[in-house]
Amino acid sequence: MSSCSSLSMDDRVKIGYGSIAGASLSIIGSIGTIILIKIRNKKQEKKLLIQRKQQLSINNLNINSGSSSNIITISNSTTSLSSNNLNIQPPSFPSYSPLPTSISLSNNNNNNKNNNQKTKVSHFIINLSIANLLASIFMITIKLMMIHFNDKFIKVLPSTANHSFNALISVCTIGNGVIGFSFISTFFWTLAISMYIYQQFLSSSTINSNNNNNNINNINNNNNNNINNINNSKNNNSINNFNNSNKSNKIIKMLFYFVCWVIPFVLGSILVSGSRLIELNSDLPWCSIDSNIQLISFYFPLIICLLATTFFTILIKYKFSNDKLACSSSSLINLQSKIIQRLILFLIVILVCWVPSLISFFISFFSKNCKQFLWLEIISSTIQSCQGILNFLSYLSIFKKLKLYFKNLKKKFNNNNSNNSNNSNNNNSNNFNGGGIFYSKGKKVNNQNSNNFYFTFSTFDFDNNQIQEK
């Protein structure tokens, strides 16, 4: 979508093939990301269903055996504390009416609906992958038509032939709009991921703090009314929280859809209106976008999204550093750390893909002769088309695994050169777990959070029930 015409026909062909190569890889990466998320979500749903059935069986067994009087329910189907573990004496009355099975079933159903209706990070990544997929498909189609079907590429539609020159509609001008729409949508969805994760970090800290205070107050109440008060308050709170969160999540979801799809579509339409045909008498006619319109409708939203995503990522990192000192849950710390690592990778991807394009645009924008560098144009066009495949690699944490692999390889090489064979063997056993890049470190591997190398980020739904200590 360059606004200059200083490059030759051969130069534009080279740039076009670079974009086609990068877009082809991005199609593979975008489809792979969507498939992996869908598979992981199915596995998570089956796992949660099994856990709910097991919890329901335990509740029914406790009710039938009469031993449920020693169980204090703290959260819906997720955490239970024994009165013996809390050093609280059981109620002095001989027996009481336990919680009916129907209430347990109702709570399980509410939790299931609540989890399904939560706005999840994996859902945001799917939309980001769809936007990358559309951008790649449009990029390949437009570039191939420009190179091999140029007569149809610049052919003006009959309905617009009698209009002004800048308003001529062709495949070329429409292509500028749809490519711009898709790429702008990727900017907005990347920003949406960082904003949503930051909001979840804040809300999870607040909810956990309130839940802990309420649990302590409820446990310190009169032992005779302790269980009834907790059950009644939690049932009422679960219903109210479900209704409120359901409404708020629907509003948030619709807002994100509007911002990340509708607004980019409007901006893409502006790019179409700002496109014009140039070099009609050359061997490879093409169309360009007015530099001012391109700045306002494309690069200005890009700059805003880059700055905002960086800002929210820094806030999340700062928030995590503060919460880490006060949090005693190692599993929660590991989960939050993985979320931040992948968010940083997504930020790095969008910076790597679009900073060269920004540099190229502003060089031509402020130069008098619309100066362009062929090598910079090829790099920027190729890398920006690779956003989908780079997001896919970030989703798999390939970069971190490669770094760990080469670090361990260096340690292994140093250990082999050491004269102390015992220390060498110990270091090798500590540094390697399976000896390949598709495995985690051998030290302190959390089976619950590191079961599968390929499916990590899709588990970071960060629902309130998931972030509590189990």
From Swiss-Prot:
Keywords per UniProt: Disulfide bond, G-protein coupled receptor, Glycoprotein, Membrane, Receptor, Transducer, Transmembrane, Transmembrane helix
Predominant localisation class: membrane
InterPro entries: GPCR_Rhodpsn, GPCR_Rhodpsn_7TM
SUPFAM superfamilies in the cross-refs: Family A G protein-coupled receptor-like
Keyword Signal among record annotations: no
Disulfide bonds: C172-C287
Residue intervals on the Extracellular side: 1-16, 145-176, 275-295, 364-372
TM region positions: 17-37, 124-144, 177-197, 254-274, 296-316, 343-363, 373-393
Gene3D superfamilies attached to this UniProt entry: Rhodopsin 7-helix transmembrane proteins
Topological domain ranges for the Cytoplasmic compartment: 38-123, 198-253, 317-342, 394-470
Domain of life assignment: Eukaryota
GO MF term list: G protein-coupled receptor activity
UniProt record, GO biological process: adenylate cyclase-activating G protein-coupled receptor signaling pathway
Topological type in the membrane: Multi-pass membrane protein
Location within or outside the cell: Membrane
Glycosylation sites: N162
Keyword Lyase assigned: no
Gene Ontology CC, one term: plasma membrane
Reported function: Receptor for cAMP.
Protein family per UniProt: Belongs to the G-protein coupled receptor 5 family.
Protein name: Cyclic AMP receptor-like protein D
UniProt source species: Dictyostelium discoideum (Social amoeba)
